[in-house]
Amino acid sequence: MPDITIALSKGRIFEDTIPFLEAAGIIPQDDPDTSRKLIIETNRPDVRLVMVRATDVPTYVQYGAADLGVAGKDVLLEHDGVGLYQPLDLKIARCHMMVAVRDGYDYASAVFQGARLRVATKYVKTARSHFAAKGMHVDLIKLYGSMELAPLVDLADAIVDLVSTGGTLKANRLQAVEEIMPISARLIVNQAALKLKNPTIQPLLEAFNAAIPANV
C-alpha cells in the first residue's frame, strides 16, 4: 500500500491542483473526469490519490483514511476541523461567499428595519455566524443545490452561496448584496500523519508552497 494518500474532488479543484502535484513530482496515471476509478495511482509508488465528494475531503483526512487533501475554505468552515492541520492557502478555486437577493428586493431596508429574513444556503454554520455577528435574526433553510431558485419561488428572501463571475445570479435575476468572505482552496493534513510520516509529507508541503501562484 502506498505510504501517502491524498484526497481530492473532481472538477475545478482537481484541475487546479495538478500543477501542485507536478511540482511535487506526482503524475496521476488516470484522468478522474474520464475514469471510473476512485483510487488513482500515480507515477510514484509511495503516493496515491482518492477521489471523493468535495464535502467529504475533510472527513477522509480527519479520520486518517487520507493523509492530505485539498478542500475549499467553504467546506472547511462547515466541518468541525478536529485533527486537521491547514498549512497552506493554495490560492486556487477562488470565489466569494455572498448574500444575494432577487432583483428589486430592498435588502438594506430589511436589515435596517430588523426584519426576520428567510435565508437558503448549504453553508448553515457560516451563514449563522455571519448574521449573528450583524445582530440579525434569520431563519436558515438548508438546501443542497439550485440555490438561486429559492428567492424566485418565495422559499427564501435571500441566499448565501459561492459566487465566481456572477453570471448565474444575473441569469436568474438575482444580485449580490453583501460579501461574507473570499474563498479559496486549502491544503489540509492529518495531524497524526504529519508527525508519523513527516519525512515524506514535509517535502510535499514545501513543493506545494513553492507552487502557490504569486500576486494572486
From Swiss-Prot:
A GO CC term attached to the entry: cytoplasm
Cited InterPro entries: ATP_PRibTrfase_cat, ATP_PRibTrfase_CS, ATP_PRibTrfase_HisG, ATP_PRibTrfase_HisG_short
Gene3D superfamilies documented for this protein: Periplasmic binding protein-like II (3.40.190.10)
Signal peptide: none
Source taxon at top rank: Bacteria
Alphabetized UniProt keyword annotations: Amino-acid biosynthesis, ATP-binding, Cytoplasm, Glycosyltransferase, Histidine biosynthesis, Nucleotide-binding, Transferase
Enzyme class: transferase
The enzyme's E.C. designation: 2.4.2.17
GO MF annotation terms: ATP binding; ATP phosphoribosyltransferase activity
Reaction(s) catalysed by this chain's protein: 1-(5-phospho-beta-D-ribosyl)-ATP + diphosphate = 5-phospho-alpha-D-ribose 1-diphosphate + ATP
GO terms under biological process: L-histidine biosynthetic process
Subcellular location: Cytoplasm
Pathway(s) this gene product operates in, as recorded in its UniProt entry: Amino-acid biosynthesis; L-histidine biosynthesis; L-histidine from 5-phospho-alpha-D-ribose 1-diphosphate: step 1/9
Regions that span the bilayer: none
Function summary: Catalyzes the condensation of ATP and 5-phosphoribose 1-diphosphate to form N'-(5'-phosphoribosyl)-ATP (PR-ATP). Has a crucial role in the pathway because the rate of histidine biosynthesis seems to be controlled primarily by regulation of HisG enzymatic activity.
Family: Belongs to the ATP phosphoribosyltransferase family. Short subfamily.
Record text on subunit structure and interactions: Heteromultimer composed of HisG and HisZ subunits.
Domain notes: Lacks the C-terminal regulatory region which is replaced by HisZ.
Annotated NCBIfam families: hisG
Protein name in UniProt: ATP phosphoribosyltransferase
Gene name for this UniProt entry: hisG
